[in-house]
Amino acid sequence: MGGAISKKRSKPPRDLRQRLLRARGENYGRLFKGVEDGSSQSLGGLDKGLSSLSCEGQKYNQGEYMNTPWRNPAEERKKLPYRKQNIDDIDEEDDDLVGIPVEARVPLRTMSYKLAIDMSHFIKEKGGLEGIYYSARRHRILDIYLEKEEGIIPDWQIHSGPGIRYLKMFGWLWKLIPVNVSDEAQEDEEHYLVHPAQTSQWDDPWGEVLAWKFDPTLAYTYEAYIRYPEEFGSKSGLSEKEVKRRLAARGLLEMADRKETS
């Protein structure tokens, strides 16, 4: 299912995995006891160019649900100046920007079920996200990569939470799993305060350290919807009162209120 799209491509993708790993740290394979070593090495000869761009954390907005259909490419083009400003927010010593297109190579489009599956398999075949720590910075890198290379509007990375995070975009096969940082890693001055294993706790509203994991069953099991229908609002079939009750029970309403007043 995922191999067809990769065979159609005339050139390899930009080096997504390597740029993600350069975003202050490697994957959890080198910091956790009992985890197979060497998983931080890329498996494919990916193209060069994607930079370690600074990221902004995703803000939880009640009513912002899967694939946000009210957004369209024409409106997104109007936001290009703002996005260019975000792209400029990089480390001064980063020299990997040469060759990165400021605008998308292809027409803008929203993420779809089929596209999410194809991109998930394609990324996996070219090295993947497996074992890489999640952070707001890496979230933004992935957004920019798929926007510039595939024209995918960056509104699709909205996860459930806390615990195992499932993307609310049905078809994306990478989930985020909470991981426990070893005492050795916590006390390692080389990684402390700069490694994503430390900083990702600041990016996450629940203070969890997260890492990507491939799960092919997400192609036919809509886990985010099954487990957390209240996060889909009226699309869930639940009453407004029940939606608010469930969101409040999980602390999401209070969290949204704090962000609005901050």
Curated annotation (Swiss-Prot):
Membrane topology summary: Lipid-anchor
GO function terms (MF aspect): GTP binding
Lineage: superkingdom: Viruses
Region (Mediates dimerization): 140-156
Keyword vocabulary terms for this entry: Host cell membrane, Host membrane, Host-virus interaction, Lipoprotein, Membrane, Myristate, Viral immunoevasion, Virulence
Principal place of residence: host cell
The keyword Lipoprotein is assigned to this record: yes
Region Acidic: start-end pairs: 88-96
One annotated Gene Ontology cellular component of this protein: membrane
Pfam families assigned: F-protein
Compartments it resides in: Host cell membrane
Positions where lipid (N-myristoyl glycine) attaches: G2
Gene3D superfamilies: Nef Regulatory Factor
Task of the protein: Seems to play a role in optimizing the host cell environment for viral replication without causing cell death by apoptosis. Enhances virus infectivity and pathogenicity. Probably involved in viral immune evasion mechanisms. In infected CD4(+) T-lymphocytes, down-regulates cell surface expression of CD4, CD28, CD3, and MHC-I or MHC-II molecules.
Record's subunit section: Homodimer. Interacts with host CD247/TCRZ; this interaction induces down-regulation of cell surface TCR/CD3 complexes.
Family: Belongs to the lentivirus primate group Nef protein family.
Comment block on domains: The N-terminal domain is composed of the N-myristoyl glycine and of a cluster of positively charged amino acids. It is required for inner plasma membrane targeting of Nef.
Note: This is a macaque isolate.
Protein's UniProt name: Protein Nef
Organism expressing this protein natively: Simian immunodeficiency virus (isolate Mm142-83)
